[in-house]
Design a protein with these regions (language model features):
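Sequence context surrounding c-type heme c attachment/ligation sites in exported
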Residues: 47-62, 72-77, 130-136
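Sec-dependent signal peptide recognition
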Residues: 2-9, 13
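N-terminal signal peptide c-region/cleavage motif recognized by signal peptidases
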Residues: 15-17
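Electrostatic cytochrome c docking/interface patches
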Residues: 22-56
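The canonical Cys-X-X-Cys-His
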Residues: 49, 57-68, 95, 111, ...
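Glycine-rich, acidic and aromatic/proline-enriched surface loops and short helix-turn segments
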Residues: 58, 101-105
Length: 151
């Protein structure tokens, strides 16, 4: 029993600093759609971001966007802009704002806000007050998008 309590205490002490750096969805600071500061206080992982981008149950970005960097993925969307060279067109802070809540940049967009926890309709009660992506997943997707440059 002592070791279980000690393990929980240890995990709590080391997990809290990581959570303390994370910006809650309601606290994200947008400046004309731009989010300058990382949502997590650390750099995103482009490889993990690629996985989130392609995952039909997470980002599902390919439902709307085409991306020729992912030829192994089928059924790229044609509704939203092609993402080839997106890192040449937008800065990291702009992409962070677009992924977090595209409506702050493009008022009439159909793109979902991936990092908000209110002001939307969720089809299942279990998803109320929850963002689609975590702060880390947003940072990871942004890191991945920053790799998409023209050749």
């Amino acid at each position: 029993m002592k070791s279980a309590v000690g393990l929980v205490a240890f995990a709590t002490v080391f997990a809290l600093p990581a959570l303390a750096d994370e910006v809650a969805p309601s606290d994200v600071m947008f400046n004309d759609g731009v989010v300058e500061a990382s949502l997590t206080g650390k750099a995103g992982d482009a490889t993990a971001g690629r996985d989130v981008f392609a995952n039909r149950k997470l980002g599902n970005c390919l439902a709307c966007h085409a991306n020729s960097e992912m030829p192994e993925q089928s059924f790229h969307g044609e509704v939203a802009p092609l993402l080839d060279g997106v890192a040449d067109r937008w800065e990291e802070a702009q992409l962070r704002g677009i992924v977090a809540n595209a409506k702050m940049t493009f008022e009439d967009t159909m793109m979902p806000a991936f990092y908000i926890d209110s002001g939307y309709v969720r089809p299942l009660d279990g998803f109320e007050s929850k963002s689609i992506l975590t702060a880390q997943q947003v940072e990871d997707v942004v890191a991945y998008l920053m790799t998409l440059k023209e050749e």
